[in-house]
């Protein structure tokens, strides 16, 4: 069995307050990845989630751009990505209420909930693949946490299924992943 972890494919990171052309460009790739996932692939999404106190958090002070505010349009998974998931019968139609076992709500870059899940259930998977946004922030954070939880697991990150805050930051994150024995393609 394989695990596909789709990191933060949310509106605010694609065409919202922190969106970019690079993020928009990977949407069709991520959609295709979900649609082509085999029946023995478990798909988990993460959703970056902030609240009205965002400005008071360290992230809010260092990145003063409100994004992914709980239950806002920017917080929702991109429609095309969501539709690929729904079409496969994996989730309920209501975006705000993804099935708990397939979505991880996280309030920071890396998810300890994902890491704990991997430490507990990782032995059930032959491989873990990551895709999503942003390569140099949330993707690399979660990939490295997965490596810590599962030091002997084959973990893959496909560079065409991720986008960074800049091309340079994207490439730097891929270099870090390779250094930590992540299969980067």
Please annotate each region the language model reported.
Residues 103-141, 163-185:
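Conserved N-terminal glycine/acidic-rich loop preference
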Residues 143, 147-148:
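Surface-exposed amphipathic alpha-helices with a cationic face
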């Amino acid at each position: 069995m394989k695990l596909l972890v789709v990191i933060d494919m949310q509106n605010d990171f694609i065409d919202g307050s922190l969106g970019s052309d690079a993020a928009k460009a990977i949407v069709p790739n991520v959609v295709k990845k979900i649609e082509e996932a085999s029946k023995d692939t478990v798909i988990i999404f993460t959703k970056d989630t902030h609240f009205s106190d965002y400005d008071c958090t360290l992230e809010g002070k260092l990145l003063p751009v409100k994004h992914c505010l709980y239950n806002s349009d920017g917080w929702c998974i991109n429609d095309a990505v969501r539709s690929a998931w729904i079409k496969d019968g994996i989730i309920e139609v209501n975006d705000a209420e993804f099935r708990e076992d397939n979505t991880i709500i996280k309030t920071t870059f890396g998810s300890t909930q994902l890491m704990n899940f991997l430490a507990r259930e990782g032995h059930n998977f032959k491989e873990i693949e990551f895709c999503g946004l942003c390569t140099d922030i949330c993707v690399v954070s979660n990939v490295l946490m997965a490596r810590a939880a599962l030091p002997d697991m084959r973990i893959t990150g496909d560079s065409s299924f991720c986008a960074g805050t800049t091309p340079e930051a994207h490439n730097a994150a891929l270099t870090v992943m390779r250094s930590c024995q992540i299969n980067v393609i």
